[in-house]
């Protein structure tokens, strides 16, 4: 059973603990979340499905955060067409996974200046 769950969670290294004796201090064993007191430390024990939901939620939050940072960075450079710039930036990110959004965006701006408005703010003000 532990192998099946570890595979489902995409975990290579795992520790399986069998609790033979424990005492419920408060609450209900039917809850999907337990707080266990082990060696003067509190540990959180989640139901596998709850853990999967938590991981999926975290993944979605991280994706949304990335999308917002990417959008902010692109829009700050005054793109002619946001979607075109985003497509080029995402392709560049696949090639260089270690570069930051700003590094990739600067590279795209140098290699594809036609994707951005050329605003000389000193002449405007």
UniProtKB/Swiss-Prot annotation:
It comes from the Bacteria. InterPro entries: UPF0763. Belongs to the UPF0763 family. This is UPF0763 protein NAMH_0545.
């Amino acid at each position: 059973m532990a192998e099946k769950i570890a595979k489902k969670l995409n975990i290579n290294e795992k520790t399986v603990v069998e609790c033979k004796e424990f005492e419920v201090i408060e609450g209900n064993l039917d809850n999907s979340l337990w707080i266990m007191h082990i060696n003067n430390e509190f540990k959180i024990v989640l139901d596998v499905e709850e853990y999967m939901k938590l991981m999926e939620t975290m993944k979605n939050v991280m994706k949304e955060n990335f999308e917002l940072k990417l959008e902010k960075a692109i829009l700050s450079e005054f793109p002619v067409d946001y979607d075109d710039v985003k497509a080029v930036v995402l392709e560049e990110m696949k090639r260089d996974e270690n570069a930051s959004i700003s590094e990739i965006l600067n590279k795209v701006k140098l290699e594809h200046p036609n994707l951005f408005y050329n605003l000389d703010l000193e002449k405007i003000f």
